[in-house]
Amino acid sequence: MGAPLCDNAAAGSTAPAFNVGVRLHDLPEGSVEKRILMAGELGFTCIQLPSKVVYKSYGIDRTGLDEDLAARLRAVLDEAGVHVAVFGCYKNLATPDAAQLAESLEDYRACTRFAALLGGCAVGTETGRPNAGNKVADDRFEPAAMDAFCGGLANACELAEAAGVPLLIEPGWNEVVNTPERCREVLDRVDSTALGVIYDPVSLLHPTVAAQSADVVRRMLELNGDAIRVLHAKDYEVVDNEDSDGWCDGSGSRLVCHGAGETGAFDFAPLADWARKVRPGIDCVIENSTPATNVACRDYLLGL
């Protein structure tokens, strides 16, 4: 299902746990190329590059993901000294709308091919919701939601295998794959050499379980650690209302996300320990930082 676990015996306890990266759209405004260079100047070693950011920057759609653009971006990446950890194609693979799913699969076809042209980086995807509007609702907990997602994912994995790149799912409370156990179920049901996981530990939390975050992390690593290829890092606070969409669970509170280390609510140190033992130097992309905080978030992760 995943690559063999790495042996970190020679790395030593002081080896960096992570290659720390940033989402390109969390940097100051600018073109894709300007932001890639900025990431390198700020000391990041990898980036998450969303396809929608590429489309907006170059005024293209998926048909513009061609060899010339890939060569242009590779040159800038080399100049900046960074690599693409994840090329994002976050489409709803659990939709019941057959036409919508077919259209999304064409996006995955284009994005997996482009990822191969970029050098073989992973393509990242969400785990969807079983309604055509992609709305957060209780239908995501139903067995039928898992059936729908696994069916769509299997098709996307075939495209990733054909392109020779990994396809990584990112579990989250607001989506179909919303617990460590459901992630394991997907990995068992979808038999693909391309399939792996982006693990964002905060994305699997919600107010009712936030105090048990260490147990959620333990279960995720025990059940799915062999498939984790990239980490996402953020922090959170719990606020006493459910006035807007977010990490809500009917408790009257919701999680509001911040950059890694900003609030101190989530301790990323156990993930650093795991990475040193199992995935030394794993790409770890900061989420929910801002131009004012992304360097401090980077330093927090590098200091673990």
Question: What do the predicted segments below correspond to?
Answer:
Residues 44, 115, 120, 228, ...:
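A structural motif
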